[in-house]
Protein backbone atom coordinates (compact mmCIF):
# COMPACT_ATOMS: atom_id res chain seq x y z
CA UNK A 1 0.00 0.00 0.00
CA UNK A 2 1.43 3.34 -1.10
CA UNK A 3 0.35 6.82 -0.04
CA UNK A 4 1.17 9.61 -2.48
CA UNK A 5 0.60 13.37 -2.39
CA UNK A 6 0.58 15.41 -5.60
CA UNK A 7 1.25 19.16 -5.37
CA UNK A 8 1.55 21.70 -8.21
CA UNK A 9 4.69 23.59 -9.17
CA UNK A 10 2.66 26.74 -8.43
CA UNK A 11 2.32 25.74 -4.77
CA UNK A 12 4.07 28.86 -3.43
CA UNK A 13 2.64 31.28 -5.98
CA UNK A 14 1.31 33.73 -3.36
CA UNK A 15 4.45 33.79 -1.19
CA UNK A 16 5.87 37.30 -0.80
CA UNK A 17 9.51 36.23 -0.55
CA UNK A 18 11.74 33.17 -0.67
CA UNK A 19 11.76 32.81 3.11
CA UNK A 20 7.97 32.52 3.23
CA UNK A 21 7.97 30.17 0.23
CA UNK A 22 10.48 27.90 1.96
CA UNK A 23 8.46 27.90 5.18
CA UNK A 24 5.29 26.89 3.30
CA UNK A 25 7.08 23.95 1.73
CA UNK A 26 8.30 22.97 5.18
CA UNK A 27 4.69 22.62 6.32
CA UNK A 28 3.97 20.30 3.38
CA UNK A 29 7.02 18.21 4.25
CA UNK A 30 5.91 18.05 7.90
CA UNK A 31 2.46 16.83 6.85
CA UNK A 32 4.04 14.14 4.66
CA UNK A 33 6.17 13.01 7.59
CA UNK A 34 3.40 13.06 10.20
CA UNK A 35 0.95 11.08 8.05
CA UNK A 36 3.53 8.58 6.76
CA UNK A 37 3.34 9.58 3.11
CA UNK A 38 5.56 7.48 0.85
CA UNK A 39 5.86 9.80 -2.14
CA UNK A 40 5.47 13.53 -2.81
CA UNK A 41 5.11 14.40 -6.49
CA UNK A 42 5.51 17.92 -7.89
CA UNK A 43 3.48 18.17 -11.10
CA UNK A 44 3.81 21.07 -13.59
CA UNK A 45 1.47 24.06 -13.50
CA UNK A 46 3.54 26.58 -15.43
CA UNK A 47 0.55 28.85 -16.10
CA UNK A 48 0.09 29.32 -12.37
CA UNK A 49 3.73 29.82 -11.42
CA UNK A 50 5.04 33.21 -10.41
CA UNK A 51 8.50 33.89 -9.02
CA UNK A 52 9.31 30.39 -7.76
CA UNK A 53 8.41 27.39 -9.86
CA UNK A 54 8.76 23.64 -9.93
CA UNK A 55 12.55 23.53 -9.66
CA UNK A 56 12.46 25.53 -6.44
CA UNK A 57 9.57 23.51 -5.00
CA UNK A 58 11.22 20.18 -5.82
CA UNK A 59 14.65 21.17 -4.48
CA UNK A 60 13.34 22.46 -1.15
CA UNK A 61 11.11 19.42 -0.63
CA UNK A 62 13.97 17.07 -1.51
CA UNK A 63 16.21 18.84 0.99
CA UNK A 64 13.54 18.61 3.69
CA UNK A 65 13.08 14.89 2.98
CA UNK A 66 16.82 14.21 3.31
CA UNK A 67 18.11 13.16 6.75
CA UNK A 68 20.13 16.00 8.34
CA UNK A 69 23.27 13.84 8.47
CA UNK A 70 23.23 13.51 4.64
CA UNK A 71 22.32 17.03 3.57
CA UNK A 72 25.87 18.34 3.29
CA UNK A 73 26.83 15.31 1.21
CA UNK A 74 23.73 15.42 -1.00
CA UNK A 75 23.42 19.16 -1.65
CA UNK A 76 25.95 21.73 -2.67
CA UNK A 77 25.39 25.45 -2.09
CA UNK A 78 22.20 26.38 -3.93
CA UNK A 79 20.28 29.59 -4.23
CA UNK A 80 17.01 27.69 -3.69
CA UNK A 81 18.19 26.67 -0.22
CA UNK A 82 19.12 30.15 1.01
CA UNK A 83 16.45 29.93 3.74
CA UNK A 84 16.60 26.19 4.44
CA UNK A 85 17.13 27.08 8.09
CA UNK A 86 13.43 27.94 8.49
CA UNK A 87 12.37 24.40 7.55
CA UNK A 88 10.86 22.61 10.56
CA UNK A 89 12.61 19.40 11.66
CA UNK A 90 10.77 16.29 10.47
CA UNK A 91 12.23 13.88 13.03
CA UNK A 92 11.11 10.83 11.10
CA UNK A 93 11.28 7.74 13.27
CA UNK A 94 13.32 6.03 10.54
CA UNK A 95 15.96 8.78 10.90
CA UNK A 96 16.17 8.71 14.67
CA UNK A 97 16.05 4.94 15.06
CA UNK A 98 12.91 4.97 17.20
CA UNK A 99 11.11 2.89 14.56
CA UNK A 100 13.57 0.02 14.76
CA UNK A 101 12.65 -3.61 15.26
CA UNK A 102 14.54 -6.57 16.59
CA UNK A 103 16.31 -7.01 13.25
CA UNK A 104 17.69 -3.46 13.25
CA UNK A 105 16.72 -0.01 12.06
CA UNK A 106 16.73 1.24 8.47
CA UNK A 107 18.78 4.31 7.56
CA UNK A 108 19.46 6.25 4.40
CA UNK A 109 23.03 6.38 3.18
CA UNK A 110 25.01 7.78 0.27
CA UNK A 111 27.64 5.71 -1.51
CA UNK A 112 30.91 7.66 -1.31
CA UNK A 113 33.20 5.09 -2.93
CA UNK A 114 32.84 1.88 -4.92
CA UNK A 115 35.84 -0.34 -4.28
CA UNK A 116 37.04 -3.71 -5.42
CA UNK A 117 35.89 -7.15 -4.35
CA UNK A 118 32.28 -6.06 -4.00
CA UNK A 119 32.81 -3.55 -1.21
CA UNK A 120 31.50 0.02 -1.02
CA UNK A 121 31.91 2.89 1.44
CA UNK A 122 28.70 4.51 2.62
CA UNK A 123 27.99 7.66 4.61
CA UNK A 124 25.00 6.84 6.79
CA UNK A 125 25.43 9.31 9.62
CA UNK A 126 27.94 7.33 11.65
CA UNK A 127 31.16 8.97 12.84
CA UNK A 128 32.87 7.84 9.63
CA UNK A 129 31.71 6.26 6.35
CA UNK A 130 31.43 2.51 6.77
CA UNK A 131 32.62 -0.26 4.46
CA UNK A 132 29.94 -2.73 3.41
CA UNK A 133 29.61 -5.75 1.15
CA UNK A 134 27.54 -5.25 -1.98
CA UNK A 135 24.84 -7.97 -1.89
CA UNK A 136 24.70 -10.39 -4.85
CA UNK A 137 22.63 -8.98 -7.70
CA UNK A 138 22.69 -5.46 -6.26
CA UNK A 139 24.80 -2.90 -8.16
CA UNK A 140 25.29 0.57 -6.67
CA UNK A 141 27.19 3.58 -7.95
CA UNK A 142 29.01 6.47 -6.31
CA UNK A 143 26.59 9.18 -5.14
CA UNK A 144 23.61 6.81 -5.07
CA UNK A 145 21.28 6.81 -2.09
CA UNK A 146 20.89 3.41 -0.52
CA UNK A 147 19.09 1.76 2.38
CA UNK A 148 21.11 0.27 5.22
CA UNK A 149 19.94 -1.96 8.03
CA UNK A 150 21.92 -1.21 11.18
CA UNK A 151 21.82 -4.01 13.75
CA UNK A 152 24.47 -2.59 16.07
CA UNK A 153 26.26 0.72 16.52
CA UNK A 154 29.03 -0.41 18.90
CA UNK A 155 30.61 -2.25 17.25
CA UNK A 156 29.08 -1.18 13.93
CA UNK A 157 27.18 -3.98 12.24
CA UNK A 158 25.22 -3.05 9.14
CA UNK A 159 24.36 -4.27 5.66
CA UNK A 160 22.95 -2.94 2.41
CA UNK A 161 19.36 -4.01 1.79
CA UNK A 162 17.14 -3.72 -1.25
CA UNK A 163 14.34 -1.91 0.60
CA UNK A 164 12.67 1.43 -0.18
CA UNK A 165 14.48 4.43 1.27
CA UNK A 166 13.19 5.33 4.75
CA UNK A 167 10.94 8.39 4.85
CA UNK A 168 9.26 9.81 1.75
CA UNK A 169 10.62 10.35 -1.73
CA UNK A 170 10.22 13.52 -3.80
CA UNK A 171 9.97 13.56 -7.57
CA UNK A 172 8.84 15.82 -10.37
CA UNK A 173 6.56 14.28 -12.96
CA UNK A 174 3.35 14.85 -14.90
CA UNK A 175 0.01 14.51 -13.18
CA UNK A 176 -1.18 11.90 -15.67
CA UNK A 177 1.89 9.74 -15.15
CA UNK A 178 1.42 9.92 -11.38
CA UNK A 179 -2.22 8.83 -11.67
CA UNK A 180 -1.31 5.97 -14.01
CA UNK A 181 1.04 4.28 -11.54
CA UNK A 182 0.15 0.72 -10.72
CA UNK A 183 0.31 1.59 -7.01
CA UNK A 184 -1.76 4.80 -7.26
CA UNK A 185 -4.62 3.23 -5.30
CA UNK A 186 -7.68 5.44 -4.76
CA UNK A 187 -7.13 8.61 -6.84
CA UNK A 188 -8.61 11.63 -5.08
CA UNK A 189 -8.74 15.23 -6.27
CA UNK A 190 -9.36 17.92 -3.65
CA UNK A 191 -11.58 20.87 -4.53
CA UNK A 192 -14.17 23.13 -2.95
CA UNK A 193 -16.49 21.89 -5.72
CA UNK A 194 -16.09 18.24 -4.70
CA UNK A 195 -18.21 15.97 -2.52
CA UNK A 196 -18.24 17.32 1.05
CA UNK A 197 -16.38 14.81 3.18
CA UNK A 198 -18.59 13.61 6.03
CA UNK A 199 -18.50 11.02 8.77
CA UNK A 200 -20.87 8.89 6.72
CA UNK A 201 -18.77 8.94 3.54
CA UNK A 202 -15.39 8.72 5.27
CA UNK A 203 -15.81 5.06 6.20
CA UNK A 204 -15.97 3.87 2.60
CA UNK A 205 -12.90 5.81 1.59
CA UNK A 206 -10.99 4.67 4.66
CA UNK A 207 -11.57 1.00 3.86
CA UNK A 208 -10.52 1.40 0.21
CA UNK A 209 -7.41 3.37 1.14
CA UNK A 210 -6.36 0.78 3.74
CA UNK A 211 -6.68 -1.90 1.07
CA UNK A 212 -5.38 -0.19 -2.08
CA UNK A 213 -3.42 2.89 -0.97
CA UNK A 214 -4.19 6.44 -2.06
CA UNK A 215 -3.02 9.27 -4.30
CA UNK A 216 -4.29 12.72 -3.32
CA UNK A 217 -3.88 15.75 -5.61
CA UNK A 218 -4.01 19.37 -4.46
CA UNK A 219 -4.34 22.71 -6.20
CA UNK A 220 -2.70 26.04 -5.46
CA UNK A 221 -4.00 29.20 -3.72
CA UNK A 222 -6.55 31.00 -5.91
CA UNK A 223 -5.95 28.33 -8.56
CA UNK A 224 -7.63 25.03 -7.82
CA UNK A 225 -7.38 21.77 -9.70
CA UNK A 226 -10.34 22.41 -12.06
CA UNK A 227 -8.71 25.36 -13.89
CA UNK A 228 -5.34 23.60 -13.85
CA UNK A 229 -6.84 20.58 -15.59
CA UNK A 230 -9.28 22.43 -17.83
CA UNK A 231 -12.24 20.93 -15.97
CA UNK A 232 -15.34 23.01 -15.30
CA UNK A 233 -16.81 23.32 -11.83
CA UNK A 234 -20.10 22.08 -13.32
CA UNK A 235 -18.44 18.83 -14.41
CA UNK A 236 -17.11 18.29 -10.89
CA UNK A 237 -20.50 19.09 -9.37
CA UNK A 238 -22.21 16.68 -11.76
CA UNK A 239 -19.94 13.84 -10.69
CA UNK A 240 -20.90 14.59 -7.08
CA UNK A 241 -24.67 14.81 -7.57
CA UNK A 242 -25.01 12.04 -10.18
CA UNK A 243 -23.69 8.72 -8.91
CA UNK A 244 -23.69 7.32 -12.45
CA UNK A 245 -21.36 10.05 -13.76
CA UNK A 246 -17.63 9.38 -13.86
CA UNK A 247 -15.33 11.65 -11.91
CA UNK A 248 -13.52 13.93 -14.40
CA UNK A 249 -9.80 14.02 -15.21
CA UNK A 250 -9.17 10.32 -14.43
CA UNK A 251 -9.77 10.62 -10.70
CA UNK A 252 -11.90 8.20 -8.72
CA UNK A 253 -13.41 10.99 -6.61
CA UNK A 254 -13.39 14.74 -6.10
CA UNK A 255 -13.61 15.63 -2.41
CA UNK A 256 -14.13 18.83 -0.48
CA UNK A 257 -12.25 17.99 2.70
CA UNK A 258 -12.93 21.40 4.31
CA UNK A 259 -16.66 21.73 3.55
CA UNK A 260 -17.33 24.61 5.93
CA UNK A 261 -14.22 26.68 5.34
CA UNK A 262 -14.22 30.04 7.04
CA UNK A 263 -11.65 31.68 4.78
CA UNK A 264 -12.12 32.56 1.13
CA UNK A 265 -8.82 30.89 0.26
CA UNK A 266 -7.41 27.70 1.76
CA UNK A 267 -3.67 27.48 1.29
CA UNK A 268 -2.25 24.28 -0.10
CA UNK A 269 -0.30 23.43 3.05
CA UNK A 270 -3.51 23.87 5.08
CA UNK A 271 -5.46 21.65 2.69
CA UNK A 272 -2.77 18.95 2.87
CA UNK A 273 -2.94 18.83 6.67
CA UNK A 274 -6.75 18.84 6.79
CA UNK A 275 -7.12 16.22 4.07
CA UNK A 276 -4.53 13.75 5.30
CA UNK A 277 -5.79 14.15 8.85
CA UNK A 278 -9.28 13.13 7.71
CA UNK A 279 -8.33 10.31 5.36
CA UNK A 280 -6.05 8.60 7.89
CA UNK A 281 -8.58 8.48 10.73
CA UNK A 282 -9.26 5.05 12.17
CA UNK A 283 -12.33 3.68 13.89
Swiss-Prot record:
Record organism: Halobacterium salinarum (strain ATCC 700922 / JCM 11081 / NRC-1) (Halobacterium halobium)
CDD domains: HsC9orf114-like
Protein name as annotated: Uncharacterized protein VNG_1688C
InterPro entries with a match to the protein in the record: Alpha/beta_knot_MTases, NA-bd_OB-fold, Put_MeTrfase-C9orf114-like, tRNA_m1G_MTases_N
Source taxonomy: Archaea, Methanobacteriati, Methanobacteriota, Stenosarchaea group, Halobacteria
Amino acid sequence: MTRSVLVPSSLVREAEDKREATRKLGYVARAAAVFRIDRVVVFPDEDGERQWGGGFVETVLRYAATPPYLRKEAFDTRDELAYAGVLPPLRLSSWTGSDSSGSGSLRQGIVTQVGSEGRVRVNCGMQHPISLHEPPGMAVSEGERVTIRVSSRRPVRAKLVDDPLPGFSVERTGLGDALDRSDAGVRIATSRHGEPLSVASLGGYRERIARDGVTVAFGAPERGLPPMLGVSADAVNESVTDSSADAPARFDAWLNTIPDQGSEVVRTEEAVLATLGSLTLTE
